Amino acid sequence: MKEMVSSSTFRAPGGLGFLGPSKIGLIPLRNRSGVRSRVKYIAPKCAVSSARPASQPRFIQHKKEAFWFYRFLSIVYDHVINPGHWTEDMRDDALEPAELYHHGLKVVDVGGGTGFTTLGIVKHVDNENVTLLDQSPHQLEKARQKVALNGVNIIEGDAEDLPYPTDTFDRYVSAGSIEYWPDPQRGIREAYRVLKLGGVACLIGPVHPTFWLSRFFADMWMLFPKEEEYIEWFQKAGFQDVKIKRIGPKWYRGVRRHGLIMGCSVTGVKRSSGDSPLQLGPKAEDVEKPVNPFTFIFRFVMGTICASYYVLVPIYMWMKDQIVPKDQPI
């Protein structure tokens, strides 16, 4: 399933989503084999219902509280989350727009966690030219245990405040991280800042579901942006040639209905050197403020319940895929 949206023809709508066909934001559809045959164009459709504003953090969008969530998630991430939401085929497909065509490219993988996405990057780029950054020491410890990542620079850091000078990297990659950011616009602005002139940012993340129950759990749990939100954030940060590529397991025929932790790959090009033209105020989140233990326990339990729903959804979709004819939606 490969579908692309280009900002050259895309204009973010002012309403709640795409309500019908339009000449704006046309997507070329290809067949399942990925071979371009008779091309058909549609307008991208997102949930008509209003999503919870990105400025209102979900249960797992608080860095200090998420620290403990990551600690336990790191134990099962590669074995439980990835098989249903982030397979090797999906990873390689999603990284294709990043144009990792030369082994000498300097690449940063922001929010790289256990290093699953980094494993896809080092297929094309020399390990010593790759940096893996994440805020969770427990996730990074799992990455350090992967022999294939020997030589990769693995460091702890904040996606919204990258510890690098302006114009440092040729490629910026971030997969499965934006949904945890308290301020996604700030993180994408940082992506622009640390890239060199002509650099490409490739951000892989979830999509907002349309089914009411999935939408409820998504908005409670973490950030599931709409496609037009991704494009707006990239363009505001200064990126040009912004494109969206829809991704998902072949058996998961409900990416837009139920959402997916890895549902699209968004790319943009930095056409001017220097800092982003977007100026933002100070961070809204105070990570030094002590966490109320009762609030933390409530949020942690509720966040875990929401996460469990999205662990079960891929299993449900796989079972339906085995039953429902391939030419019918599920």
UniProtKB/Swiss-Prot annotation:
UniProt keyword Nuclease present: no
Region feature (SAM motif III): 193-206
Region called SAM motif II, residue ranges: 152-165
Pathway: Cofactor biosynthesis; tocopherol biosynthesis
Chief site of localization: plastid
Listed GO CC annotations: chloroplast inner membrane
Transit peptide as recorded in UniProt: 1-45
Ranges for region SAM motif I: 107-116
Gene3D superfamilies per the UniProt record, alphabetical: Vaccinia Virus protein VP39
Chloroplast recorded as keyword: yes
Positions of transmembrane segments: 296-316
GO biological process, one term: vitamin E biosynthetic process
Places the protein is found: Plastid, Chloroplast inner membrane
Its membrane topology: Single-pass membrane protein
Taxonomy, superkingdom: Eukaryota
A Pfam family per the record: Methyltransf_11
Catalytic activities: 2-methyl-6-phytyl-1,4-benzene-1,4-diol + S-adenosyl-L-methionine = 2,3-dimethyl-6-phytylbenzene-1,4-diol + S-adenosyl-L-homocysteine + H(+); 2-methyl-6-(all-trans-nonaprenyl)benzene-1,4-diol + S-adenosyl-L-methionine = plastoquinol-9 + S-adenosyl-L-homocysteine + H(+); 6-geranylgeranyl-2-methylbenzene-1,4-diol + S-adenosyl-L-methionine = 6-geranylgeranyl-2,3-dimethylbenzene-1,4-diol + S-adenosyl-L-homocysteine + H(+)
All ranges on the Chloroplast intermembrane side of the membrane: 46-295
EC number(s) recorded for this UniProt protein: 2.1.1.295
Ranges in the topological domain labelled Stromal: 317-330
Annotated function: Involved in a key methylation step in both tocopherols (vitamin E) and plastoquinone synthesis. Catalyzes the conversion of 2-methyl-6-phytyl-1,4-hydroquinone (MPBQ) to 2,3-dimethyl-6-phytyl-1,4-hydroquinone (DMPQ, a substrate for tocopherol cyclase), and 2-methyl-6-solanyl-1,4-benzoquinone (MSBQ) to plastoquinone.
Homology family: Belongs to the class I-like SAM-binding methyltransferase superfamily. MPBQ/MBSQ MT family.
PANTHER family: 2-METHYL-6-PHYTYL-1,4-HYDROQUINONE METHYLTRANSFERASE 1, CHLOROPLASTIC (PTHR44516:SF8), 2-METHYL-6-PHYTYL-1,4-HYDROQUINONE METHYLTRANSFERASE, CHLOROPLASTIC (PTHR44516)
Designated name of the protein: 2-methyl-6-phytyl-1,4-hydroquinone methyltransferase 1, chloroplastic
The gene coding this protein: ARSM2
